[in-house]
Curated annotation (Swiss-Prot):
Protein name in the entry: Beta-(1-->2)glucan export ATP-binding/permease protein NdvA
Positions of ATP binding: G373, P374, T375, G376, A377, G378, K379, S380
Subunit structure: Homodimer.
Enzyme Commission designation: 7.5.2.3
Molecular function via GO: ABC-type beta-glucan transporter activity; ATP binding; ATP hydrolysis activity; ATPase-coupled lipid transmembrane transporter activity
Gene: ndvA
Domain ABC transmembrane type-1: 21-306
Alphabetized UniProt keyword annotations: ATP-binding, Cell inner membrane, Cell membrane, Membrane, Nucleotide-binding, Sugar transport, Translocase, Transmembrane, Transmembrane helix, Transport
Function: Involved in beta-(1-->2)glucan export. Transmembrane domains (TMD) form a pore in the inner membrane and the ATP-binding domain (NBD) is responsible for energy generation.
Organism: Bradyrhizobium diazoefficiens (strain JCM 10833 / BCRC 13528 / IAM 13628 / NBRC 14792 / USDA 110)
Compartment(s): Cell inner membrane
Topology relative to the membrane: Multi-pass membrane protein
InterPro entries found in the cross-reference section: AAA+_ATPase (IPR003593), ABC1_TM_dom (IPR011527), ABC1_TM_sf (IPR036640), ABC_transporter-like_ATP-bd (IPR003439), ABC_transporter-like_CS (IPR017871), NdvA (IPR005896), P-loop_NTPase (IPR027417), Type_1_exporter (IPR039421)
The UniProt record lists the keyword Coiled coil: no
Family membership: Belongs to the ABC transporter superfamily. Beta-(1-->2)glucan exporter (TC 3.A.1.108.1) family.
Length: 602
């Protein structure tokens, strides 16, 4: 994407503010014309004062009055443009930031798993700030500066083409110098932004794992790593700053050289009667004005160039396409009963190896279907397809007889509740976390859901529903977080429930409490359970055994054990361990009883 096309897109993002942008552009055109008038009037006044008649008038007062009028107009118009440009840029920055935030929340989990959240935050804030600066600078002064140059050069030719040549030479030098520096530093600035991204990601990574950093005494190491990246950033930034500092120095030198050149040529032309003192003064003012405007144009180009890497990153994220979206004819499904059908469903992440292949099964309303198999067998993919994290490449999934692709994502996901392996909580109050399931839930409804999820006791003990859960729920224990997520699912009251290893990370005592809560939330719902611990799915209506993306066995727990297949091997392995543990416990108890009996004997 070239600098021009990049900036065109920046202006396209004005959206609803584009009409105000056009009005500001017109106001800038008027400002450019009025700024050109001032040096002309100044020159005419000098000519009159030096005894030369101008336009048939020997009085300077009419020119002075016109100058005052143009000055007042310029002041008023500049103030209005600055005020409206400020408001436009601030309003649109907030609008774009909100749109970006909504966009990244809709991107697939595969995108988020491969992109650091700290980088996404950095891209969002840096990108919207870059847009704000460019909009503000463009409408406040840069567009007026560009128009001033466009207006001034041809009119200076009309007034005195000999002196105007010097102004054209000045523009050519500026253009050549700016083009050279932009090309020279383009790659350098890209490297600078890469270092900024690395710096942001590294800092975010360390701050997100403070407990790990402190427990493994990694503070100094992490600081040293960040310092190393910061030093690399400075090394990459310094050459860019040096080149643009050179532009500034040459710009200032050009002011002096151009003014001296105009005076030198002007005196020579005056001696030959080819110009007046007023015209010399006029062109000195032109040169000063032109250099001022060229500096603003160079500043504009520099700003676009410096912001380009940030904007490219921003647009790259903005251009990322959500994996799924609503069809134009998608309908609101309303409240579903929970009949789920998979028919010959095949899906591949990379287009080569299928994650699930020819998957077919039916879950009736109220049934519990367990998905069992090794990691990577396709269990989580099947569930992801159910709530349309992705769409299958072939086959279809129906709920209550409706293809899930034919209903809106909002209505589909409103009918599905998920209890994750790791309870996901916001750094907000317990009440706000519960209301994720039902935004308009009353306190009475939250209390009832918490009680059913066996969470009310610890909520009241910790200070009530307004207690903050901490970042990612760290103010609560693992079991408390999980019971909150179950209460959240109860509040949502979906007809379809997904339990993704909901108790695998809990201790035995906590697991008993959570399982009791899960029994409550599963009642009367179509439930899909992803499980490795087979004891948790003993009472499932149906168990699907996954291997390499296919269902290789299907049936109840007892039926699958009786078949003697892969599931039976898993069951024997897990329950043999449990039986051995119980046997060891019984042996320990027996030994203790024997010792106690012997001690009592005379």
């Amino acid at each position: 994407m070239s600098i021009f096309s990049l900036y065109t897109r920046v202006l396209e993002l004005l959206g609803k503010e584009a009409r105000l942008g056009w009005l500001l552009a017109f106001a800038n055109l008027l400002l450019a014309a009025s700024q050109f008038a001032e040096p002309v009037l100044f020159g005419r006044i000098v000519d009159v004062l030096s005894g030369k008649s101008v336009a048939g008038s020997s009085s300077a007062w009419p020119f002075l009055a016109a100058w005052v009028a143009f000055g007042l107009f310029t002041i008023a118009c500049s103030a209005l443009v600055a005020l409206q440009a400020d408001r436009l840029s601030h309003r649109q920055r907030q609008a774009v930031l909100t749109d970006y935030f909504e966009h990244i929340l809709q991107l697939p989990l595969t995108f988020h798993s491969g992109t650091h959240s700290g980088r996404l935050m950095k891209v969002m804030l840096n990108g919207t700030d870059a847009l704000w600066r460019l909009w503000l600078g463009f409408f406040r002064e840069h567009f007026a500066a560009i128009l001033s140059v466009v207006v001034l050069l041809p009119l200076s030719l009309y007034l005195n083409w000999r002196l105007a040549i010097l102004l054209f030479v000045l523009c050519i030098v500026f253009t050549a110098l700016t083009t050279f520096v932009v090309r020279r530093t383009f790659g350098m600035q890209m490297a600078v932004e890469e270092h900024y991204s690395e710096l942001s990601a590294r800092a975010s990574d360390a701050l997100g794992n403070v407990a790990l950093v402190q427990s493994f005494v990694r503070v100094e190491s992490e600081v040293q790593g960040l310092r190393s990246v910061a030093n690399q950033l400075l090394e990459a930034q310094m050459p860019v700053l040096s080149w643009w500092a050179l532009v500034t120095v040459i710009t200032r030198a050009s002011t002096t050289i151009t003014v001296l050149a105009i005076f030198t040529l002007g005196i020579a032309l005056h001696d030959q009667g080819l110009t007046s003192v007023g015209e010399i003064v006029m062109f000195v003012s032109f040169a000063t004005l032109l250099i001022q405007k060229l500096e603003q144009v160079v500043s504009f180009i520099n700003n676009v160039f410096m912001e380009a890497p940030r904007l490219r990153e921003f647009f790259n994220v903005l251009d990322a396409v959500p994996a799924v979206h609503d069809r134009p004819d998608a309908i609101d499904a309303g409240r579903l009963s929970g009949l789920v059908e998979f028919n010959d469903v095949t899906f591949s992440y990379d287009g080569k190896r299928p994650a699930v292949e020819d998957l077919s099964f039916t879950a009736l309303p109220g049934q519990t279907v367990a998905l069992v198999g090794p990691t990577g067998a396709g269990k989580s993919t099947a569930i992801a397809l159910l709530h349309r994290a992705f769409d299958p490449q072939s086959g279809f999934i129906r709920i209550d007889g409706m293809d899930v692709r034919g209903v809106t994502l909002t209505s589909l996901r409103r009918n599905i509740g998920v209890v994750f392996q790791e309870a996901l909580l916001f750094n907000r109050s317990i009440a706000e976390n519960l209301r994720v399931g039902k935004p308009d839930a009353t306190e009475a409804e939250m209390r009832k859901a918490a009680e059913r999820a066996q969470a009310l006791e610890f909520i009241e003990r910790s200070g009530g529903f307004e207690t903050n859960a901490g970042e990612r729920g760290r103010m609560l224990s693992g079991g408390e977080r999980q019971r909150l997520s179950i209460a959240r699912a109860l509040l949502k009251d979906p007809p379809i429930l997904i339990l993704d290893e909901a108790t695998s990370a809990l201790d035995a005592v906590t697991e008993v409490k959570v399982n009791a809560a899960l029994d409550e939330v599963m009642r009367g719902r179509t439930t899909f359970v992803i499980a490795h611990r087979l004891a948790t799915i003993r009472n499932a209506t149906r168990i699907l055994v996954f291997e390499n993306g296919r269902v290789t066995e299907s049936g109840t727990f007892d039926e699958l054990v009786a078949k003697g297949g892969h599931f039976a091997e898993l069951a024997r392995a897990q329950f043999m361990v449990q039986e051995q543990s119980r046997a060891n416990t019984r042996a320990s108890v027996t030994a203790a009883e024997t010792i106690a009996t012997a001690a009592k004997s005379p």
